[in-house]
């Protein structure tokens, strides 16, 4: 794949030039994303993503040639790896896997409770026959398999470790009944008499009760929910410790907080998802905080990107929760939104202009944490020639703007392959076709990550072997010849001004 990525460079370069005024986008769009705006994006990228390196290569005469090559990014460019071994042919799987370590330096591993633990007490850590490539290659209707997009955890983790990339676990706790919360929680652990009480009340009757009244009505299930939530967190922490570098501890709970449903001391939360343990976000962070090593980052993640989410994070931290990273999402699931953006029209998502993006991120940054754009979707409307160009232009301009945000630590693309999303997600939001043919959006992203945002320089040494340059933060390899003509190499990490050899 490395050769393929570089081999596509000419096409990627042509695409980047065309995007300066790509006719797929309207004049109204380009007025919003004009040269002055692009220069401001560049200025912020230089300010926030680069640092000044200072090298002293002892014994190197003045004027000697020094080659500087960035070999990895400090910034996280990720994608989920939910389709691991599931694409139907060895060639497709190979192309998919080769993206991790070339384009992506991070992978999000699926730990959705509902499919991770299909039966209580039987988490799917290890692969079974149904998790093998052979099983999926023979599968005629993969989307209807119960574990579609939910590979067993350990093979995906081991693969990412073999590539030397960062791993992100998603999620530990989430109230969503469709995607995460197992039915067996209620079916197996709510006693028959308590089930009968709930069914007799019905949804409307239950809604009239206070959390305290509900907890009194179903005391056993209230305790069992809390116990099983804690058990899940403990199992994941004990299994992976420091192998997985970060976790979405709680996913999409800010709506409950914004509605006043997260009440300290309550035994039950009347979540918009359904019944949850009381103050479940606080409880989750209190549980996992002592379990994971300090070098494992504990994230909160949400689709809300407003003051309510910032207030939630500040509240949790004020109450003693260790939260290291604040995750935010931007799913342009509706292809019409991408068409509207291309036509210069305004959509409800805060991505209409760079200034709107910066303002939104400034709101989240008030929590004082690094930001992770944890789930990104940009569709190619109709997936025709124009639609794919729209996707590519939006990808380039949005990634550039997000990359320019000071507190941003990473961006994670969601569905890498067309027609491989969850039911209800667009089938045309991939960087690749279903057959793993690269789309223009892939070339646009690859051009940024592996070309424009990687520093490669040939410099001349100054007096006393001193070499200075400004480059993107990350790991560098420096090559030179000493006074005797022997080849020399050294590596260093550029994280702040003054770093070097």
Regions inferred by a protein language model and the residue ranges of each:
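Aromatic-rich peripheral "rim/lid" segments of glycoside hydrolase catalytic domains that contact
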Residues: 22-24, 29-30, 187, 191-194, ...
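Short Pro-Gly-centered beta-turn/loop motif in secreted/extracellular proteins
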Residues: 89-102, 467-477
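Hydrophobic h-region of N-terminal signal peptides that target proteins for export
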Residues: 9-18
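Hydrophobic faces of well-ordered beta-strands that scaffold small-molecule active sites
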Residues: 77-79, 104-109, 167-171, 245-249, ...
């Amino acid at each position: 794949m490395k050769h393929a990525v570089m081999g596509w460079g000419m096409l990627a370069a042509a695409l980047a030039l065309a995007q300066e005024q790509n006719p797929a986008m309207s004049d109204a769009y380009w007025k919003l994303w004009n040269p002055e705006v692009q220069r401001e994006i560049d200025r912020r990228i230089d300010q926030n993503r680069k640092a000044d390196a200072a090298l002293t290569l002892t014994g190197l005469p003045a004027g000697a040639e020094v080659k500087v090559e960035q070999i990895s990014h400090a910034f996280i460019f990720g994608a989920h790896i939910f389709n691991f071994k599931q694409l139907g042919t060895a060639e497709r799987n190979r192309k998919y896997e080769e993206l991790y370590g070339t384009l992506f330096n991070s992978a999000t591993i699926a730990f959705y409770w509902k499919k991770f633990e299909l039966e209580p007490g039987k988490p799917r850590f290890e692969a079974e026959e149904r998790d093998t490539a052979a099983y999926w290659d023979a599968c005629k209707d993969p989307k209807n398999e119960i574990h579609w997009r939910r590979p067993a955890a350990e093979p995906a983790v081991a693969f990412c470790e073999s590539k030397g990339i960062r791993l992100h676990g998603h999620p530990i706790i989430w109230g969503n009944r469709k995607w995460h919360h197992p039915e067996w929680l209620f079916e197996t652990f709510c006693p028959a008499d308590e089930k009968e009480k709930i069914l007799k009340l019905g949804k409307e009757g239950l809604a009239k009760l206070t959390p305290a009244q509900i907890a009194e009505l179903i005391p056993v299930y209230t305790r069992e929910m809390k116990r099983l939530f804690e058990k899940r967190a403990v199992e994941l922490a004990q299994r992976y410790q420091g192998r997985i570098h970060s976790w979405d501890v709680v996913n999409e709970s800010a709506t409950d907080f914004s509605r006043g449903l997260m009440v300290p001391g309550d035994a039950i939360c009347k979540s918009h998802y359904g019944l949850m343990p009381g103050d479940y976000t606080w409880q989750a962070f209190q549980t996992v905080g002592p379990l994971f090593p300090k070098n494992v980052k504990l994230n909160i993640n949400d689709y809300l990107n407003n003051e309510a989410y910032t207030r939630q994070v500040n509240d949790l931290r004020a109450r003693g929760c260790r939260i290291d990273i604040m995750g935010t999402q931007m799913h342009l699931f509706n292809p019409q939104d991408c068409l509207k953006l291309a036509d210069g029209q305004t959509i409800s998502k805060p991505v209409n202009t760079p200034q709107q993006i910066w303002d939104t991120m400034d709101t989240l940054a008030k929590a004082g944490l690094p930001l992770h754009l944890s789930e990104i979707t940009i569709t190619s409307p109709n997936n025709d020639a124009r639609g794919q160009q729209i996707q590519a232009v939006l990808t380039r301009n949005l990634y550039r703007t997000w990359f320019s945000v000071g507190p941003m630590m990473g961006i994670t693309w969601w569905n890498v392959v067309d027609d491989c999303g969850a039911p209800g997600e667009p089938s045309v939001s991939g960087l690749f076709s279903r057959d793993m043919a690269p789309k223009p959006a892939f070339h646009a992203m690859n051009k940024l990550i592996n070309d424009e945002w990687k520093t490669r320089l040939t410099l001349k040494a100054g007096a006393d072997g001193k070499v200075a340059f400004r480059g993107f933060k990350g790991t560098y390899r420096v090559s030179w010849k000493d006074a005797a003509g022997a080849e020399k190499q050294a590596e260093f990490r550029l994280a702040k001004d003054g770093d070097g050899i």
